[in-house]
Amino acid sequence: MPIEFGERIRRIPAYPLAAGYSLGEDVAMLASNESCFEPHPDAIAAAHEALAGVNRYPDPSYQPLRRALGDRYGIPPQRIVLGNGSCDILLSAGEALLEPGAEIVYAWPAFSVYPHLGAASGARAIEVPLDSEDRHDLDAMAAEITVATRLVLVCNPNNPTSTSLALDEIESFLGRVPSHCAVILDEAYCEFALVLGDTYASVELLRSHPNLMLLRTFSKAYGLAGLRVGYGLCGSEALRAAIDQVRQPFYLNTPAQAAAVQALGHQDEVERRVAHTVGARIELSEGLRGLGCWVAESDANFVWTHLPDPDVEAEIVSGLSERGVLVRAGSSLGRAGALRVTIGTEAENERFLGAMGELL
């Protein structure tokens, strides 16, 4: 007799894994929105030094990293939640806030992990379509919030569409969300978003919204994707405590903590790398438009493009792969006929545009 699994397993969608990790070195990896820059040398050195102590469990209080983040953003450490990547925090938030009979509201397409929260908890997931410019339709989202809504997710900049909401739009929306409902503003790509001004701007929203969390990561601008370090800045200690209550112990390893603390200390280098990425993003967008593609106004470290003929998506993705260029197909992210393309090195970007010129 086969093993009987829980009913929720049948509801949870599989995460769309990126391909290419076993294809060798001569591949342009433009599918996972990683940084094309290595971590800062001090972050690498800190992680290496920390390896000598991994016979011991990590510091379960994570105080050095909490304090470093608190000092940077002016947030008390007890209102900062950490995680093994921001996905870890998202899933824990779902476990803490959702249950059968509750509701979760988010735009779609958005980050591929969002559907897991409702499916795993048995909560009703309400997916609100993006508007005609592939941006969040905040009016439509607000209209879906009820007394049963426990959690609202806003991905800004949005993954996979790269589009952003201005701070005043977000602030107005938050004023329409009842206090019983938690809001996670997923800001994984905020460092690249010129429309937001700077990474401190949205932190001010926490002063008047105790139900709000700003979810961020070291995987993108800081180049620590392989170490998996995410963090959330919470409007209240109660929200942080509820999420931590459902966590496994020792969820953030010692080298990752050490590297993240060091990475925070080199903001000038982070800003230089972000500026380089933004410049390359503009060039890549212009190149795609020159090939007849519609390209969203990106505020991330990737671009989102609609192909001139949506029916050739699979052919284009396959042709790029044959030429050693890996991108993410829109059909795997909720919108057929599109591509999500990470900003890579200058050589990788040129290789991608050259391949697209051959295929279109």
Q: Where is each model-derived feature located?
A:
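Conserved PLP-binding catalytic core of the aspartate aminotransferase-like
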Residues: 278, 290-323, 339, 343
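PLP-dependent aminotransferase class I/II
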Residues: 211-296
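Conserved N-terminal alpha-helix of the aminotransferase class I/II PLP-enzyme fold
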Residues: 45, 49-84, 281
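PLP-dependent enzyme catalytic core of the Aspartate aminotransferase-like
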Residues: 168, 311, 318-328, 332-360
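PLP-dependent aminotransferase-like
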Residues: 96-154
